[in-house]
Amino acid sequence: MSYYAFEGLIPVVHPDAFVHPSAVLIGDVIVGAGVYIGPLASLRGDYGRLILEAGSNLQDGCIMHGYCDTDTIVHENGHIGHGAILHGCVVGRDALVGMNSVIMDGAMIGEESIVAAMSFVKAGFQGEARQLLVGSPARVLRQVTDQELHWKRLNTKEYQDLAIRCRTGLSETKPLTQVEENRPRLKGTTDVKPKSAQ
């Protein structure tokens, strides 16, 4: 793992969190229990404070950063999809930010909300609970349904379980030169399916 102190501030990572070895954490970063941080994530706490609360996840290639004297926060059980950028914003408890979305400075995503993939949330946006945000710039499409929230929670549970699985089952290795006979498939821990398959 790549951890860097910056002007005396050292990242804080709970022992029950998983941080992929290729992720980079710099300075004022606080990572809670059961958090999953994926490959190539960049958390640059060289200006503002970056906080990932318990049970949240920050997936592959995500970026967290913020201006001085700001907190960029992913609250408990927050779910940040591949390639998303969080800059000086707050993601509420149990909310989901979809893949390659951008959440700008001073924006607040309400608890149990979903930001659709590829959305752009403008600076200063103040969301409410259970909003479905879509587009660039993002607009409120409607309320998140109970079914969608259940789907989100199953996905978040997968990442909470993945943090545990990676702490014990992930290791650097050399590749095989051929596919072995009867190669097994990996399984998740819930019955979650892609939205298109529901």
Curated annotation (Swiss-Prot):
<comment type="function">
    <text>Overproduction of CaiE stimulates the activity of CaiB and CaiD.</text>
</comment>
<dbReference type="InterPro" id="IPR011004">
    <property type="entry name" value="Trimer_LpxA-like_sf"/>
</dbReference>
<dbReference type="InterPro" id="IPR050484">
    <property type="entry name" value="Transf_Hexapept/Carb_Anhydrase"/>
</dbReference>
<dbReference type="InterPro" id="IPR001451">
    <property type="entry name" value="Hexapep"/>
</dbReference>
<keyword id="KW-0808">Transferase</keyword>
<dbReference type="InterPro" id="IPR023446">
    <property type="entry name" value="CaiE"/>
</dbReference>
<comment type="pathway">
    <text>Amine and polyamine metabolism; carnitine metabolism.</text>
</comment>
<dbReference type="Pfam" id="PF00132">
    <property type="entry name" value="Hexapep"/>
</dbReference>
<comment type="similarity">
    <text>Belongs to the transferase hexapeptide repeat family.</text>
</comment>
<dbReference type="GO" id="GO:0009437">
    <property type="term" value="P:carnitine metabolic process"/>
</dbReference>
<feature type="compositionally biased region" description="Basic and acidic residues">
    <location>
        <begin position="180"/>
        <end position="198"/>
    </location>
</feature>
<feature type="region of interest" description="Disordered">
    <location>
        <begin position="179"/>
        <end position="198"/>
    </location>
</feature>
<keyword id="KW-0677">Repeat</keyword>
<dbReference type="GO" id="GO:0016740">
    <property type="term" value="F:transferase activity"/>
</dbReference>
<protein>
    <recommendedName>
        <fullName>Carnitine operon protein CaiE</fullName>
    </recommendedName>
</protein>
